[in-house]
Amino acid sequence: MSLFGIFSQAYAQVPLAFHDVMLQGFMWNSHTTTKWSVLKPQASEIAESFTLVWLPPSAAAEGGGTSNVGYHPYQWSNQNSSWGTRTQLEALITDLKAGGVKVLADIVVNHRAGNGWCDGFPTDNFGEYGVFTLKASHITKDDEASGQSACSGKLSDQNDWNFDKPIEYGGGYKAARDLAHSLTEVRDAVKAYLIWMKNEIGYDGFRWDVVKGFNPAYIR
């Protein structure tokens, strides 16, 4: 489950009269054919048919080779990924926007990867928007890490969000640590990340990954 958002003057949401034609600018295992450096020379051609491009998660992420497509983010403020460097990403966004194409970031904030079960999240430095270090105390208490002796007593006292619906709606994400969005520190870090992605990297909007994993009241 995901949610798309385009920046407006108030909240990040899709306008009622939405007429853009979107291109998904990647595939699950397309690191070679859709790297930033490969897409950049095609920016003008893309602009002939599309007004919006959805790019894959651009933050540094867990995994190697074709298994690392960005959906287990390791450090949000590090925009060097398997798709290319931050410099290459910014150059791609600049060329797309020069042709009138808006660019969506694939945002993964439901969960984080680290060095261990409950520790090892690198510090995120968003410059003027703040510096944040998420810790074990920012992980939901019902995360899989709760079963690890090394994490005993370290997790937050917050449960993961659940829609009170069948299991496919809400609940935890086993492959990485679930962040407790009910905590102010987590929400502040996410907010700084989004503003930084817009103002510093140049994105126009967001596609939210695993949006079912946290309270929708926090997306606005």
Where are these regions (language model features)?
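Substrate-binding/active-site clefts of carbohydrate-active enzymes
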Residues: 12-44, 48-201, 217-220
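Bacterial N-terminal signal peptides
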Residues: 1-6
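Short catalytic-loop micro-motif centered on adjacent basic/acidic residues
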Residues: 205-211
